[in-house]
Amino acid sequence: MKVTLIAILTCAAVLVLHTTAAEELEAESQLMEVGMPDTELAAVDEERLFECSVSCEIEKEGNKDCKKKKCKGGWKCKFNMCVKA
């Protein structure tokens, strides 16, 4: 019984990870189809990093917990930086 449950949960986890990776690849390929050069993608990444860092610092100075509002679209705020989720 335990082995079956572990196998089912493992398969479900692999399926979720595979689906997430496939969605990221599809989104990246759509960006590249539009013709956005790598330099523009890097600029977007730097902008998100800056926005997240500034947002976290402002909230920390106000003695509030850092809420990760600025990072969206597969990004999350970690250590005052937006990182790919």
UniProtKB/Swiss-Prot annotation:
One Pfam family per UniProt? Toxin_20
Can you cite an annotated GO cellular component? extracellular region
Which InterPro entries does UniProt cross-reference here? Hwtx-2-like (IPR012625)
Q: Which domain of life is it from?
A: Eukaryota
Q: Which residues form the propeptide?
A: 23-48
Protein name, per record: U4-theraphotoxin-Hhn1e
Q: What is the disulfide pattern of this chain? A: 52-66, 56-77, 71-82
- Purpose of the protein: Postsynaptic neurotoxin.
GO molecular function, one example?
toxin activity
Cite the SUPFAM superfamilies for this sequence.
omega toxin-like
- Which positions make up the signal peptide? 1-22
